[in-house]
From Swiss-Prot:
Record bears the keyword Coiled coil: no
Self-association and partners: Part of the 30S ribosomal subunit. Forms a tight heterodimer with protein bS6.
GO biological process, one term: translation
Organism: Psychrobacter sp. (strain PRwf-1)
Name of the featured protein: Small ribosomal subunit protein bS18
Role noted for this protein: Binds as a heterodimer with protein bS6 to the central domain of the 16S rRNA, where it helps stabilize the platform of the 30S subunit.
GO molecular function, a single term: structural constituent of ribosome
Cellular component aspect of the GO annotation: cytosolic small ribosomal subunit
Xref: InterPro entries: Ribosomal_bS18, Ribosomal_bS18_CS, Ribosomal_bS18_sf
Claim: Cytoplasm is one of the keywords in the record: no
NCBIfam families assigned to the protein according to its UniProt record, in alphabetical order: S18 (TIGR00165)
Alphabetical keyword list: Ribonucleoprotein, Ribosomal protein, RNA-binding, rRNA-binding
Length: 75
């Protein structure tokens, strides 16, 4: 019987050597927001604690400045 092994998650920011997450980098921040506008937790993305805090702060700043939506499109 074959066992399914889940691929180990890793922090993308540590691997790429990114030291600071900028709130103006909207394309990067969109990858860490769910379809309904919530911040995706680090247990799903594999982001380390340090960068998850920076990510949350950057997303909140971008939302405040209307670069990102608070919620999804209600239709």
């Amino acid at each position: 019987m074959a066992r399914f092994y889940r691929r180990r998650k890793f922090c993308r920011f540590t691997a790429e050597g990114i030291t600071h997450i900028d709130y103006k980098d909207v394309e990067l921040l969109k990858q860490y927001i769910s379809d309904n506008g919530k911040i995706v937790p680090s247990r799903i993305t594999g982001t380390s604690n340090k960068y998850q805090r920076q990510l949350a702060t950057a997303i909140k700043q971008a939302r405040y400045l209307a670069l990102l939506p608070y919620t999804d499109n209600h239709q």
